[in-house]
Structure formats: C-alpha cells, structure tokens
Amino acid sequence: MKNLHFGAGNIGRGFIGELLNKSGYHITFVDINKDVVNDLKRRDTYTIRILDENIEEVELNNFDALNIAEEKEQLYTAISEVELITTSIGPNVLPIIAKDIAEGLKLKVENNNTKLLDIITCENMISGSEFLKTEVFKHLSEQEQEFVNKYVGFPNSAVDRIVPAQKHDDVLLVEVEKFCEWVIEADKIKVESNRNIEQVHYVEDLNPFIERKLFTVNTGHATLSYIANYLGIELVSDGAKHADVRKDFIAVLEETSALLEKKWGFDKAEMEAYRNKTIKRFENPRIVDNISRICRTPIRKLGYNERFIKPIREAEELGLSNSALLKACSYILTFKSEEDEQSVQLE
C-alpha cells in the first residue's frame, strides 16, 4: 500500500506518518523544505519521541520524499498511482497544492487508471477534504471530474494530537503526546484497505466528533490559558494544576459536555471519561506549551462559530447553563500582548 503525504512537518511525521507506518503503508512525504526533504531521502529511519510518564521512542522506516517545487513529474506520477493521499499542511495551503493534485489526477485519467484512490485532509478545519475537492475540481474538465467522482474518494476527517513547538539538532526528530485521535467518514472511502488504518475511528457522521473536540479540547485549552494568563502563570501544565484555574475551566467543560450530550446524544459517562482524559493531557509536564501561544488571536477565538460563542449560543437555545462559558469570555478580554495584533485591537 502506498501513501503520498503532503506536509513533512511535525504533524505529518509525528502523527499521520506514525499511524500509516504502523498500518503497513509506504509513505512518500511531499514538502518544500529542502533540509527536511533531503534528510528524509538520505536516511532510512527517523525518531518519534512520545512524551508520556515514561518517554518512549519509536523508529519509523519505509518512507521517501519529494520536493514539491523541484520534482513535479515524479509527484504527478505518484498521485496517479497511490491508494491514499493525505495532508497536514494547514487549511490556507490546500488551494495551493490543489493544482498539483489536479495535474496528477489528469495523468490518472489520461492513463485510464481505474485503481481506486482516497484523498483525506488532516487539518484543523471542518469538511477539509470536501474543500480540497472543490479546489481540485477548479482545474479539471467536466469529463475529468466525472472520472474522479467515480474512482476517487474525498472522506472528511478530524485529527487531535498535541505536538508542541520544538527545535532539535536532528531535524527529523519529533516529540508528541501519547494521545492521538483520527476520525474518518466511513461512507466516502473508496479503497477497502483505507478502512483498516490502525487507531483510526471510522464513523458515518463526523460532525459530533468535530464538535466534541472543538468544545472540549479547544474550548478547554483556551479557557485554561486565558485564566492562567490573568493569574501570571506561564505554562499550560502549571495552569492545569492550579486550583483557581481548574475550578473555572472544569466548570466550562461540564457545560460543554452537557451541551454535547443533549445535542448529539453522547453518553454521560463517555463524556466524563473524554473530559477527564483531556484534563490529564493538559497536565502533562513533559509538554512544554506556553500560555501566551495559546492566548494569541483572541478575536478569532471569539468568532460566531468558534469555541466560545457557538457553545454559548447553542446552550442558550437548548435551555442549558452557559454562565461558566460567559465568565471565560471575560478573561479573554484581559489578555494583553503587544506582539499579538488582535490583542492590541481589543484594547
């Protein structure tokens, strides 16, 4: 089984690459960073360091790499031949790679290669694969689109793993937390073997899982950080263990859990376990994550469909408590940083 993965950064190598490697895929990483690409070409293995109570190191092999700027023909050939294409490049970059993917799919059509293919984005966005499909189709004729619709799937997915900011002498070494979650829409998958990726959760409806992550991990992370920042705490792990911070951010998670249970039918015990696991992740002292980094872009985080305002609105509509969420928003307004443009705009 062959995989082409756009993005040889920490998420690509330390999350998606790990799960695909465990599942027996040969991975070709695609990136524009010459140092990373050249190292991946030169070496047979790289290391993932899992930051848990006991540090574990995993060696990955069975990979190669392509430079997206310099190896176009090899890239297009690979796109036309592999069974799985994945991405972890950031939502803003998807339209940029869409033309390259389209060129590879044109070659697939030209060769009448009816081998099935799935293209799955692993980005922090809703309906990322559908978005990429729309961008790719801008570069295809109606006949080519018809062929792609028949033989290429674009299942949406949701991903969750904390990969802290890091720098190492070994450019390929990547440190990650132990927890990871990759959820994929089952009904849009074309290739049967892509239904058997290790540790992936396959579902019919992705929306409940996207909102569970958004309203628990993202809302909780941000709430903890804004309160901790107000109290002068610098690290997420320290904030997660501070009594005053815990009181308020756990109250927020209890409100979002109640909303998720009522809206999507999540089991109460299941939500409590997910909530407690999330809190434990934030407490991990081996993940060195600065509060100031999480607090950036406060205006975006106060967006209508974002991690605070959306659960506040929906809790109100369903007659549920949202007082802890409203209190959390007041802490956002106390964040001051001359280095953050949105923080300055809030003053």
Indicate where each model-derived feature is located.
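Substrate/ligand-engaging "lid" and interaction regions
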Residues: M1-F6, N10-E347
